Amino acid sequence: MKKIGMIRSGGQTGTDRAAMDTALKYNIGLCGWCPKGGWAEDYPEAPSLLARYPQLTETPSEGTSQRTLWNMRDADAILTIMPEGIASQGTVLGVREGTRLGKPMYTASGTGDIPGILEWLRSLPDGLDLCIGGPRESECEDAYRLTGEILEQVIQKLT
């Protein structure tokens, strides 16, 4: 059985999108909640994200908070990637909710955190539904690239 059974994400640009694209590249299951209509900052009109990522499910709300809260609720564990420690409002909400729910959590800021991520993941059960989140691209220009780099190395070292 794989360590990561499912990558869960809300589909926003930056960290979320890199997590989703990495899941697809490595044939890891993909799921997550997105705002009603599939809204993301680069896909403002329906069907938006849902045309590109049909694995996502719409929340009843068009706002982003419900998406964040529901993804935290439904995950087994939460990996937050905040390049250079940049924390957006949604990222802070996710960390607070994960803490409130008592979920296993790890926060990374760069590739130097890969050994810690690996150690943390190896301490958790196989088949994880892993929620991956962090800032959107408009809040951290390097979020997509850095998240993709981290996740590629982590997945390659887990297999």
Question: Can you say where each PLM-predicted feature lies in the sequence?
Answer:
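Acidic/glycine-enriched connector segments
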Residues: 2-120, 124-129, 136-158
